[in-house]
Regions:
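Short, solvent-exposed loop/turn and secondary-structure capping segments
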Residues: 19-28, 102-107, 276, 285-288
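Intrinsic-disorder/low-complexity recognition with aromatic hotspots
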Residues: 1-70, 75-91, 99-101
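Anion-binding catalytic surfaces of enzymes that hydrolyze or transfer phosphate/sulfate esters
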Residues: 187-310
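Short C-terminal domain-edge/linker segments immediately following a structured domain
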Residues: 38-46, 122-128, 304-307
Length: 311
């Protein structure tokens, strides 16, 4: 599906999530295990009795060294199978950003598109109606208005991407496609009798013909009762053997958002996508809320990894 590139999903944790140190280990020039000093880790939010130079506080199950008390890690482990974890690799890249602002130009969507990512239906998707599709800005030098991300943050956004009107509701899907094909043939017959009296006569007629044929083709592939774009009907995502239970999916907006974006991107319907989650400024005055939010982000990250392994 799509351009055949590796699917790319960006998690934009608005507010400035604490990634380096308390979630994923950050070391010196020798890599993750080239540990910082006690004072260095303290600046990253780690107390002296939880330093990663103690092997008990390091987890490398995902091919990337996490702090064993990481909320991200707890969430990812809940959403993934042992086989998926064994096949996962990772890296951490240090980048400077400002706190509590959406002005950090770190969103990579347009760069990923420029590298060749594309989808069968959409180039880019994002869970916010912004130029980048997320909370963070896209670098000005990369912005391409032709492929501005389409907003997808719920299952109905994904399933509604292809709308064939009332035909599917009135007729059986196969009958609806037959009607559209008949319309195409009638229109084609009419076009053969029309002289547009312009130099690009054949080009115009070809575009009209292709438009009708493409509409019928989209209706044939996506206009079925069980919409192939709908994450709710994908048993790998929701259900007894799915990544999310039905109760989790119905009652957690972040899970529904994640499922919608990953359904499109990992199946090649979109080239790349951004999932924005809020509240990562940790300004609640206590640690518990931030830990729960980190764990929920981890659940969503793990869901993307697990779904990628399944499809």
């Amino acid at each position: 599906q799509g351009a055949g590139k590796i699917p790319f999903i960006c998690f934009d944790l608005a507010g400035g999530a604490n990634i380096a140190g308390s979630n994923v280990l950050m070391g010196k020039s020798g890599g993750q295990m080239d540990f910082l000093s006690t004072a260095g880790y303290n600046k990253l939010g780690l107390p002296g009795d939880m330093l990663p130079n103690d092997p008990a506080f390091v987890n490398t199950e995902l091919g990337l060294a996490f702090h064993s008390d990481s909320g991200f890690l707890r969430g990812i482990l809940q959403s993934t199978s042992p086989g998926t974890r064994a096949a996962t690799d990772g890296a951490i890249i240090a980048a400077r950003s400002e706190n509590d602002t959406g002005n950090n130009p770190h969103n990579p969507m347009y760069g990923i598109y420029k590298a060749g990512a594309n989808g069968e239906l959409l180039s880019l998707v994002g869970s916010q109606s912004s130029e980048s599709g997320g909370n963070s800005m896209a670098p000005m030098s990369l912005i391409n208005p032709e492929v501005r991300p389409t907003k997808i943050d719920r299952p109905s956004d994904a399933s509604g991407l292809v709308d064939v009107g009332d035909l599917i509701g009135i007729l059986d899907p196969s009958d609806a496609v037959a009607v559209m094909e008949s319309i195409q043939r009638i229109s084609d017959e009419k076009m053969n009798r029309v002289n547009t009296e312009i130099s690009t006569d054949e080009v115009v007629k070809k575009l009209v013909r292709c438009g009708y044929v493409k509409s019928a083709d989209l209706a044939d592939r996506y206009g079925k009762r069980a919409n192939p774009l709908d994450p709710e009907v994908d048993l790998e995502i929701v259900g007894p053997t799915g990544i999310f239970s039905r109760d989790e999916f119905d009652n957690n907006r972040e899970f529904r958002k994640t499922a919608s974006v990953m359904k499109l991107v990992l199946n090649g319907y979109a080239g790349a996508g951004t999932i924005t989650m809020g509240g990562y400024d940790y300004h609640t005055g206590e640690r518990g809320t931030g830990e729960r939010r980190d764990e929920q982000a981890g659940r969503c990250m793990g869901a993307c990894l697990e779904y990628a392994a399944r499809v």
